[in-house]
Amino acid sequence: MPAPTAPPDPERLPGFVLCRGGLEGVVAEELRDLEIAVVEKRKRAVEIETDLAGFYRANMGLRSALNVLRPIRSFNARNYDLLYYQSRKTNWHKLFPVEARIRIDIKGHSPKITHTRYAIHRVKDGITDTFRKLCEGARPTIEKRDPDVHIVVYLEKHRATLAFDTSGVPLFKRGYRLEHGGAPMKEDLAAGLVALSRWDRCSPLLDPMCGSGTLLFEAWMMAAGIAPNLHRRFGFESLYDYDREIHGQERNRLQAKERSLHEARFLGLEIDPRTFKTLERIRREHFPRAPIELKCGDFRKTDPGSGFRSAVCNPPYGMRSGDEGLISPLYEDLGAYLRQHLPGGQAGIYTANHEAAARFGGDPEDSVSLRNGSLEGRLYRVAF
C-alpha cells in the first residue's frame, strides 16, 4: 500500500521566474540564496514554489531574472477559443479591482497558438466579459505603457498558463541606466555575466572598456550584498492579496544582508569622453558609496596598477560596416593588456564577434552562450 501523500500547503504557491537562455542555472542559484524552493529548471525559466513573502523577496533580490510569474490557471491550449473560455472562467474580479489598467502579453511558444495578437485579443475578451457580467457592466481598461496589472499567457508546448507578472516592469530596469552611450547592456545580462565569470566577489575587479559601467555596478552590488530592486514599484502591489506589512518585512530582511566593502577595489576605464560623463553621473547619483574608480582614457595607455587578478569586459563587436579591420587588432591589444596586468588571473569577456574572439590569446577555458537582444553572444572565460 503506498504511503499517504501530505496535503498541499495552502500557503505555498507555484511560480515561474523568466530569464535569458543560458542564465537558468544562475537564476536557480540566486533563488536558493534567497531561500526560495527551486522545483525545476526549464528553458528560459525556473519553476519555483514559495509563499507571498517569497514572491516579494524574489522580485527585490533577483539579479539575473526578467520577470516573476504567479500562475492563476493552467490548461490544454488546443485552440484560441480555449484561451477565451479559460479566461472567462477565472474570477478576475476577486483578484484585482475593476478600475485597474491591465496589459496582456504572450510568453513562450506553442504549436497551436501561433498568432500572438489574436491570442491576446481572446484573453482580453475573456477578462473583460467576466468583469462586465459581475461588476454591473464595468471593465478594466487596456494600458500597454504603464499598467497596474500585467497578465501573461505563458505557453509551453500544448499547455497554457494564465499568470500575473508580479514584477510589473521587468526586473532588469533597476532605475540607474536611464541614459547611456552606444548600445547598453541590460542589467540582468550584466549580472549573469559577472556571476558566470568566476570572479570571487571579493578580489579587485577590472573592466578596461566599461562603457556606462553596468558590469561594474552590478558586480559591486553583488559583492556588497545589495538587493538590486529594493525601492521600486511592483505588479504585485495592485493585487487584492497584497500585504504591505510582509513586503516591508522582506525589504528589511534583504537590507540586513548588506555589508561594507572597506578594502574592495573596482576600476573602470572608458575612452569616449561623452560616455565617461554619463558614467560619472550614474556613479555620482546612484552609487555614491561604491568603491569604484573611473578613468577616462584608452586602456592601452593606462596602467591599472597592481593587484588585479580578475576582469570582466564587453568590448565592441564591430558589427557596423567599416569596423571589421579595427576589431581584430583591438581584441589582440585587449588580450595583451590583460596578460600583462592579470598575471595568473582570469577574465570573462563577452562578445558576439566569435571570429575575432580567437585574438584574445591566453588560455581559453570555455565559453557560455548568452543572447544580447538579437545577437548570439558568448562569454569567453580566459586564463592569463
Descriptions of predicted regions:
Residues 2-147:
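Non-catalytic nucleic-acid substrate-recognition regions in nucleic-acid-modifying enzymes
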Residues 8, 14, 18, 22, ...:
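Conserved Class I SAM-dependent methyltransferase catalytic core
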Residues 93-95, 301-307:
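Short amphipathic alpha-helix with an adjacent loop that forms part of the alpha/beta core around
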Residues 151-167:
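C-terminal edge-of-domain segments
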Residues 162-196:
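SAM-dependent Rossmann-like transferase core, predominantly class I methyltransferases
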Residues 185-304, 319-320, 324-326:
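Conserved S-adenosyl-L-methionine
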Residues 308-314:
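Short SAM/SAH-binding signature in class I
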